[in-house]
Amino acid sequence: SHIPHRPQGAHPEVYVEYEIGMGENDSVTREDALKKLNSQIMAGEGPDLMILDGMPVDSYMEKGVLLDLAAHLDGLSGEQELFPNLVDAFRRDGKIFMIPCEFQLPVVQGEEKYISQIDGLSGIAEAVEALRADNPGADLLDICSELGIMRTLTAVCAPSWKNEDGSIHSETISEFLENAKRVYDAQMDTLAESEIESYRQRNEEWRSYYNFTWEESPYFTNGLDEIGYIAGEKKLDFGTVGYAYGYAFATSLERRDDLAGSRTDFLNGQGGKVFIAETLAGISASSPYAEKALELLDVLIGKESVVGEFSVNKAGFEESLMPDPEVYESDDVPYSSISSSNGDGMVVEVDIYWMNEEQKERLRGWIASADKAYVSDSVLEDAVYEKGAAYILGEQSLEDAVSEIEKKMAIYMAE
């Protein structure tokens, strides 16, 4: 990982010990790793700086485990300045307990006449229903399961599933499931059995290699499938852009004659414009080395930080929009090319052009409008998926599904 090396280089006088709760090949479960960490934190023996992705951050904030970073972050200026709206998305009662080092944006790719309908979650359902009306029998999304549909829509919806105090907002979960069912029903209506079987096989192949299915993998929701979209394997492509080359790839499709009328747009879901927060850093409130930990944090969110996705640091982000001068000639000369073939022998070739100033401005506008952070909450999401699947498949009423989600979360919160 790049995380420990950069602080060590910036502060050679400080010894940075880097501890991983769960290695790729060890047998430690997520629950066991969290229990061990929680015990250390409560005893005041935990790490000074923590990467909090996938951890029970609501509980940590409630228990006063994390240091308030607001004064420190608000004091950053010049090349240290962060995107203010992304910082504000983490402010609670004036306090900030964690900050993402990097982020992605949720996007949708498709024909203008359909994606122009998408303004919020019901707009997504309307667009897919309109596509089905115009394309009977076609595979609209290349997603053939209720879990796949729910996972695809989660990032732009989940931030509205909880109230400020961490309690469940049942109405928005109900609205989510209702519209996820509309999307699922429209996608599956008239779809060939061969498409459904092919999707099932892909999931099983992933399970045999990785112990999780394709739709359970991080790659399922990350990035875009431009090749699949060009090849006609789907009519709408939901995904993310999280780095400059990925955005250049997405915008290059707008230049193709065979995709006239197609574009990529920022995706709105439930309540607000969402950005996907990643590599969430927080500092232990009981750390005896809080000052050093803040210096280490400054490196992680600094201009020079080697993050894989868009940096929350404004200067670092702007630098990432600059193409490699050894490769770049002009906006109108391909920056690179990709050729891909599928199992049917169909070859797709794509010229990728570096983004022009207008396209960069569009991206900056998307970022400036983002006001809600998506931070994964696997316990809540798994509850929604499990009970929501029964509703989407017609095995349970919407009211019963939401009621069971509430019960499951109440038990978890009480533990």
Predicted regions and their residues:
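Short, solvent-exposed loop/beta-turn-alpha elements that line the ligand-binding surface or hinge
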Residues: 71-81, 158-178, 182-183, 265-271, ...
